[in-house]
Curated annotation (Swiss-Prot):
Its main location: cytoplasm. PANTHER family: ACONITASE/IRON-RESPONSIVE ELEMENT FAMILY MEMBER. It comes from Oryza sativa subsp. japonica (Rice). Substrate binds at Q90, D209, S210, H211, R540, R545, R703, S784, R785. The lineage of its organism: Eukaryota, Viridiplantae, Streptophyta, Embryophyta, Tracheophyta. Its EC number is 4.2.1.3. Catalyzes the isomerization of citrate to isocitrate via cis-aconitate. This is Putative aconitate hydratase, cytoplasmic.
Length: 898
């Protein structure tokens, strides 16, 4: 007989007004504990989950007490389990996840167990949005042409995902062309409150995309995790996490006329980066909340990874309920959501007196003080006020190469490169805009900035301004709803006239899917070493990400993207210099094309309608003709095609037995790479184009794949052979072994040969040598890319020694059995005199019971140096994963035994 639920005494019925009941719920007020009223709303969601899932095995009563006592336990970095309500995937991360699930089924069968035990136990939603590329732009047929090319390139991947949606229960696949995962999540998938088998509970989600945090704007707790962790969550494993501190961020006042949500989010990002919020939740509150639309909140929540927080959370209030109605959720559903959240102390009513909540630290921003700004040229938190942009650009040209520098000699700063663009004279200078993209989940779901951009285009058309034809302009909305309201407003035609045709519904320029520049433009840039610029309404602008030829990349609001496209350069002072000359020969200034807040609000009010959301999402599950024509087998085990260059059986479980291998130390390892600070997951495992001379290109060419069909690294994440070769393959990666030379090569220490990283790793492996990686601060920042851990593991990397790790990447390394070590405060490779030419031994006990989370570990080198590091296995559960050789073997053995 099943044991009684430890908290069954607080299971309470929620009555419906007018009779009947909505269901039952675990009532926080019924605990009669005064500490709950002081808890941040985001922590209450963790508390409810712990109570509901308490079985005194995966989650115990002590965990519940830790969360109730959050004020005292969070500073001690207490560990808690968390079981999210659902999992969200996109196709770049979803394909390798489904590949792993399929391989796990094979492993279960080989161990003599039931393969069907490998099945998601919570709802899994997979939105295909990362495969569209901007091959065709500035054309009314762009959407159809790009989609046809997308299907041609990705036929096999899409077929595999369609197989997954039938082979696994509880998995919804949203077909390509439907929109960006986070916007679809916000407008359609987000439940806010679940009612399953008569039990009600708050929606919560983990996603294999770091911008999953966008859903926090809807009052749903959600954040990005590695694909490896997401797979374990699907299979019923609790996530182990440190109970986070919560930064209370008070908003007062309201935004000034002409200031956008993007200006606000870039300001908030800079403030929070400065405050230091890594590993923490940020919870927004204050009277300024009522002035923030839900789309504005979602924009701020979306950029949590850029300010470093786990979440940027906006509790549910009346604004949330209005948005749920606007997006087509039924009145009955919204009434149920409100009733549950009010009854369980999770609803904020600003008309009632507020109980003062306790936060770990506090920040405050008067919205009235936010000014127009952009961020760049190489990092999202390097904010530049619009009025200071020209002088900032000139100092970037002067400064030595770095996050704010290009080191262009003074005498070359004003050079003009003239070239022929399809028969017409064209010119480029340093700072010329060659890509202007309204793109990414951050902004394309926000009607005020999207319609604002369209109004800028309209005013420019009326004044006779035109974007130069050599600027690659594009518009990639987050969902079909955007197209509907742009058409309803009559403004899409003006965006089209300026070259901003819709190119597709998905992630494009922001993740490097910007497509090629015109050959004449590419040649002008590379032959003359021009520092060309991209301006995009995205959330990431790390070097080499947007496009290999745009060395300066600025994040800006959609209306500013249009303004910079019209100006054709970032080297401009919008207050003093004209953007261009109008049809009557008069100079046109920024202020002439910039819409007022009232103008924008009026268009939003008349153009964004509930029926648009309903009709868009009713069509989603029906798919589209190209998707519906894909035929897939109906077997529960996948039949791998050994010749496939997209889907390949991974080697992780090949020789697996029922006995865990135990912890591995590291003996006399060579250093594969020696890095400085801010190495992103993009540097480790790029998502964009496959360089023609790279080991991955060589592999594909040997298998008969033409260069034009290489597709991107992101689209080939279902093939470990390609991805291992693509590890550390970013063309902008800086490795100290190369003394200033940039690119994906390293030195094979024993011979001194300079080789591609993959070839060097292969050489070490064939010689029987382990390898490690040395790194600086913020190692693994950026996207939640599990291949940034899988790739190094396949290359034979046994440990990474860094000054600090980004949260998701550290847990991914643990998940793949790689040891993360941190230098002691104030120390790093340079201060310890390490060049990377040494051999490294990491002394670890061979019995896992003798290892403690966070303990000191001694590292010795062959030249007699030794130093102490902190072992970054942060929890007992992570040590168990390490003992099993990673999280997935741990799950397989557990399921096979039960």
């Amino acid at each position: 007989m099943a044991a009684e639920h430890p908290f069954k005494n607080i299971l309470t019925t929620l009555p419906k007004p007018g009779g009947g009941e909505y269901g039952k719920f675990y009532s926080l007020p019924a605990l009669n504990d005064p500490r709950i009223d002081k808890l941040p709303y985001s922590i209450r969601i963790l508390l409810e989950s712990a109570i509901r899932n308490c079985d005194n095995f995966q989650v115990n009563q002590n965990d519940v007490e830790k969360i109730i006592d959050w004020e005292n336990t969070s500073p001690k970095l207490a560990e808690i389990p968390f079981k999210p309500a659902r999992v969200l995937l996109q196709d770049f991360t979803g394909v390798p996840a489904v590949v792993d699930l399929a391989a796990m089924r094979d492993a279960m069968a080989k161990l003599g167990s039931d393969a069907n035990k490998i099945n998601p136990l919570v709802p899994v939603d997979l939105v295909i949005d990362h495969s569209v590329q901007v091959d065709v732009a500035r054309s009314p047929n762009a959407v159809q042409s790009n989609m046809e090319l997308e299907f041609k390139r990705n036929n096999e991947r899409f077929g595999f995902l369609k197989w997954g949606s039938t082979a696994f229960h509880n998995m919804l696949v949203v077909p390509p062309g439907s929109g960006i995962v986070h916007q679809v999540n916000l407008e359609y998938l987000g439940r806010v409150v679940f009612n399953t088998d008569g039990i009600m509970y708050p929606d919560s989600v983990v996603g294999t995309d770091s911008h999953t945090t966008m859903i926090d704007g809807l009052g749903v707790a959600g954040w990005g995790v590695g694909g490896i962790e997401a797979e374990a969550t699907m299979l019923g494993q609790p996530m182990s996490m440190v109970l986070p501190g919560v930064v209370g961020f008070k908003l007062t006042g309201k935004l000034q006329n002409g200031v956008t949500a993007t200006d606000l989010v870039l300001t908030v990002t800079q403030m929070l980066r400065k405050h230091g919020v890594v590993g923490k939740f940020v919870e927004f509150y204050g009277e300024g909340m009522g002035k923030l639309s839900l789309a504005d909140r979602a924009t701020i929540a979306n950029m949590s990874p850029e300010y470093g927080a786990t979440m940027g959370f906006f509790p549910v209030d009346h604004v949330t309920l209005d948005y749920l109605k606007l997006t087509g959720r039924s009145d009955e559903t919204v009434a149920m959501i409100e009733a549950y959240l009010r009854a369980n102390k999770m609803f904020v009513d600003y008309n009632e007196p507020q109980t003062e909540r306790v936060y770990s630290s506090y920040l405050e921003l008067d919205l009235n003080e936010v000014e127009p700004c952009i961020s760049g040229p190489k990092r999202p938190h390097d904010r530049v006020l619009l009025k200071e942009m020209k002088s900032d650009w000139h100092s970037c040209l002067d400064n030595r190469v770095g996050f704010k520098g290009f080191a262009v000699p003074k005498e070359q700063q004003d050079k003009v490169v003239k070239f022929d663009f399809h028969g017409q004279p064209a010119e480029l200078k340093h700072g010329s805009v060659v890509i202007a993209a309204i793109t990414s989940c951050t902004n394309t779901s926000n009607p005020s900035v999207m319609l604002g951009a369209a109004l800028v285009a309209k005013k420019a058309c009326e004044l006779g301004l035109e974007v130069k034809p050599w600027v690659k302009t594009s518009l990639a909305p987050g969902s079909g709803v955007v197209t509907k309201y742009l058409l309803q407003s009559g403004l899409q035609e003006y965006l089209n006239k300026q070259g901003f045709h819709v190119v597709g519904y998905g992630c494009t320029t922001c993740i490097g899917n910007s497509g090629d520049l015109d050959e004449s433009v590419s040649a002008a840039i590379s032959e003359n070493d021009v520092v060309a610029a991209a301006v995009l309404s995205g959330n990431r602008n790390f070097e080499g990400r947007v496009h290999p030829l745009t060395r300066a990349n600025y994040l800006a609001s959609p209306p500013l993207v249009v303004a910079y496209a019209l100006a054709g350069t970032v080297d401009i002072d919008f207050e003093k210099e004209p953007i261009g000359v109008g049809k009557d020969g008069k100079e046109v200034f920024f202020r002439d094309i910039w819409p007022s807040t009232e103008e924008i609000a009026e268009v939003v009010q008349s153009s964004v309608l509930p029926d648009m959301f309903k009709s868009t999402y009713e069509a989603i599950t029906k798919g589209n003709p190209m998707w519906n024509q894909l035929t897939v087998p109906e077997a529960s085990l996948y039949s791998w095609d050994p010749n496939s260059t997209y889907i390949h059986e991974p080697p992780y479980f090949k020789d697996m037995t029922m006995s865990p291998p135990g912890p591995h130390g590291v003996k006399n390892a060579y250093c594969l790479l020696n890095f400085g600070d801010s190495i992103t997951t993009d540097h480790i495992s790029p998502a964009g184009s496959i360089h023609k001379d790279s080991p991955a290109a060589k592999y594909l060419l040997e298998r008969g794949v033409d260069r034009k069909d290489f597709n991107s690294y992101g689209s080939r994440r279902g093939n470990d052979e390609v991805m291992a070769r693509g590890t550390f393959a970013n063309i902008r990666i800086v490795n100290k072994f190369l003394n200033g030379e940039v690119g994906p090569k390293t030195v094979h220490v024993p011979t001194g040969e300079k080789l591609y990283v993959f070839d060097a790793a292969l050489k070490y492996k064939s010689e029987g040598h382990d390898t490690i990686v040395l790194a600086g601060a913020e190692y693994g920042s950026g996207s939640s890319r599990d291949w940034a851990a899988k790739g190094p593991m396949l290359l034979g990397v046994k440990a990474v020694i860094a000054k600090s790790f980004e949260r998701i990447h550290r847990s991914n390394l643990v998940g793949m059995g790689i040891i993360p070590l941190c230098f002691k405060a104030g120390e790093d490779a340079d201060s310890l005199g390490l060049t990377g030419h040494e051999r490294y031994t990491i002394d670890l006990p061979t019995n896992v019971s003798e290892i403690r989370p966070g303990q000191d570990i001694t590292v010795t080198t062959d030249n007699g140096k030794s130093f102490t590091c902190t072992l970054r296995f942060d929890t007992e559960v992570e040590l168990a994963y390490f003992n099993h050789g990673g999280i997935l073997p741990y799950v397989i053995r557990n399921l096979a035994q039960n």
